[in-house]
Amino acid sequence: MPYHSNRELPDRVRLHLPIHAQDIFREAFNHAYERYGDPRKRHFGGGREAAAHRVAWAAVKRSYHKDGDRWVPLNGG
């Protein structure tokens, strides 16, 4: 189910990612949730929500990486 605000994100996202990364996750999740409504568009199996979570985490990892227990921007800023 789409997230309307960062406050609605799962704890594993909201409590660990910086605000900007949460925004990226939420926007990517919502877009993917809409796109993968049709099961024929899901290439790795699983449900619509699982597919959207995979896409959202991939989007976060394009801009952030985990350094120890913190997520930091790839560009160091």
Question: Each predicted region: which residue ranges?
Answer:
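C-terminal alpha-helical interaction appendages
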Residues: 1-77
